[in-house]
């Protein structure tokens, strides 16, 4: 049996041996067993995310292309809004009307950042620290 919720590591969903009970505060009942990532899984996820940011599939995108991806994400969130609101209601005990409006805001936040993705400008300043960057933002 596959769990409803899984870890996402390096673009793949995977089951997790450790889980915890998520209790709906409104009912006091367990509504789901959630994956509980262990140290190895967290380390693999962090490493995969770090590599993904440096990979040409992401690093090679223009700001405009990244903005288009954020628009697409907003559309996907909007399309899945009823399911996402129900999940959030079960997890937090909030009323569905509240979580529905919050999910709508999430989609709008992504649209906002998608719209400014190619409008932010600044200058990169070289510095003597390999793990840091300095920018002038206007």
Predicted segments with their positions:
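Terminal low-complexity tails and localization/encapsulation signals of metabolic enzymes
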Residues: 1-34, 68, 72, 120-138
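Glycine-rich loop-to-alpha-helix module at the N-terminal edge of alpha/beta enzyme cores
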Residues: 31-121
């Amino acid at each position: 049996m596959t769990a409803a919720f899984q870890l996402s590591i390096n673009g793949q969903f995977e089951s997790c041996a450790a889980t915890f009970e998520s209790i709906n505060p409104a009912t006091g009942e367990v509504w789901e067993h959630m994956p509980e990532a262990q140290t190895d899984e967290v380390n693999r996820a962090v490493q995969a995310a770090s590599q993904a940011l440096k990979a040409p599939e992401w690093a090679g995108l223009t700001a405009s292309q990244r903005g288009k991806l954020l628009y697409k994400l907003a559309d996907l969130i909007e399309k899945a809004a009823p399911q996402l609101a129900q999940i959030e209601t079960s997890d937090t005990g909030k009323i569905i009307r509240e979580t529905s409006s919050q999910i709508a805001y999430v989609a709008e936040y992504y649209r906002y950042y998608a719209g400014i993705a190619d409008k932010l400008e600044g200058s990169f300043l070289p510095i003597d620290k390999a793990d840091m960057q300095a920018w002038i933002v206007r």
